[in-house]
């Protein structure tokens, strides 16, 4: 049986990072995102600079103001965060259909079928992180392991912008040294109860037998017993069947130069073809999307008789669609190319070169 390979991707201080990206003056500052203090709001996300003052998520904003009176307080923009999250989830699904989102900024990916001797899971994780940064200009941390519990644990071990692999050769050492409060799923109340029973580390948890843990913690006891041994049989549950594959890019400045835009469409067509290759699909529709300098979004789609998957085929259709959409008088800030109506296709075995 093929050994599972699971990636857990967790965006770094997601809401605050989006705000820093959109307002560069906030970079390096203690940024706190959430509701207004006067409305009894809570902190959604705090930058690492703000965390140094003791500010953390779910903290009342009034308390955050006391801890960090000179912080930069930003009201949450959930429409923006959802839009960016959609871009990130699209990248995940360009690698595998087995994606289980846990929130706007984190997800599990089962990439077992992609792993090859020359293409380890850690390399794929880094390619995903690279793609996220290219599209969103945001960093992400990743954990790689043979089950979901360990992958999530790993993703938090080298933040921000880090990658950690937990495998059979290091899992026992990591778990034994881990503070019990750092085990995923162990909150403040559970930590306090464990301390009452002299459980402070993974080693202490490991030393308790299963029956004692069940006696102390009820049904959760069996799960805790397994966690101390790095055991987790839960599978990645795909949230939906993938219907399209696409890539989009935002220009650094608004553009109305056809040569520049067509070069970008060529690049996006190539990226989309690569992603179709990875998931072994081809498609019968091509869509080109444009966002103008005024943030108006327009798109045009063409349906095909036969499915396509190559860069050349995608580009030729995207070229025509762009020419139908463009207005020489209106600069654009974003261009996207998507292939939809996907169906299974026969592909060669993947190598590392398919991801570069």
UniProtKB/Swiss-Prot annotation:
It comes from the Bacteria. It is found in: Cytoplasm. Binds 2 magnesium ions per subunit. Keywords: Cytoplasm, DNA damage, DNA repair, DNA replication, DNA-binding, DNA-directed DNA polymerase, Magnesium, Metal-binding, Mutator protein, Nucleotidyltransferase, Transferase. It catalyses: DNA(n) + a 2'-deoxyribonucleoside 5'-triphosphate = DNA(n+1) + diphosphate. Residues 6-187 form the UmuC domain. The record marks 15 as: Substrate discrimination. Its EC number is 2.7.7.7. The keyword Manganese does not apply. The keyword NADP does not apply. The active site is at 106. One of its GO terms (biological process) is SOS response. HAMAP family: DNApol_IV. Belongs to the DNA polymerase type-Y family. NCBIfam families: PRK02406.1, PRK14133.1. Monomer. PANTHER family: DNA POLYMERASE KAPPA (PTHR11076:SF33), DNA REPAIR POLYMERASE UMUC / TRANSFERASE FAMILY MEMBER (PTHR11076). This is DNA polymerase IV. It comes from Staphylococcus epidermidis (strain ATCC 12228 / FDA PCI 1200). The gene is dinB.
